């Protein structure tokens, strides 16, 4: 009889242990609770990520607005939406050093109010930093009123410096204008990096001057030689040859009076010097 109570006690202790080891209803409840808690944690993390993305999206427009405000405060005036501009380089987009570059700027007023075009300017800038000026050209004052739905064309020219040849520079061409309310606008008609071309023709001022100097020097040498030859010819004496009268037929006797001619004919004719010399030589031989 004493053994039976002990067996019952062992059964009572062994049954709960077996239930716990097999994962009974209590164990499945604990596991379900753990899964529920994990799902809630994942959902919370997803919700937090969505909230962060929404905050980022909300911050981006704010940053853009701040950038625009900074540009409005520190930047230059912008172009008017009621105006349109075009540019045309007369000799193409070639920029030879120490040579005239000419272009035309067209302005179109698409609005309902007048625009006053004030000036047109151009400048060369450092390619990596457009705030650094390399060569700033004189602004061309225009002061031209352009009515609505009308167009105007302006001409401008500049000369790139000769030492800039063979290097790239940023070319900025600005058209400055305003409306009747006093609002100032600025349109960057051309804002690109260009390369200045070196002149290869070689016909610069120094070369032309050298050619002219050599031509003048050659002309002086030719004139000097000509004068020297002329002076030598003048120094040589000219030998005069005495020409006698070979016959009386070569002499015009019409101007002599007839009486004088009769007397000359009556008189004995003079012997020529050659005949006398011949007679003398014959007499000496005898």
Curated annotation (Swiss-Prot):
Membrane topology reported for the UniProt record: Single-pass type I membrane protein
Residue positions, PTM Phosphothreonine: 260
Cytoplasmic side: 229-286
GO cellular component, as recorded: endoplasmic reticulum; endoplasmic reticulum membrane
Positions annotated as glycosylated: 136, 191
Name by which UniProt lists this protein: Translocon-associated protein subunit alpha
Cell compartment(s), UniProt: Endoplasmic reticulum membrane
Function noted in UniProt: TRAP proteins are part of a complex whose function is to bind calcium to the ER membrane and thereby regulate the retention of ER resident proteins. May be involved in the recycling of the translocation apparatus after completion of the translocation process or may function as a membrane-bound chaperone facilitating folding of translocated proteins.
Family membership noted in the UniProt record: Belongs to the TRAP-alpha family.
Membrane-crossing segments per the record: 208-228
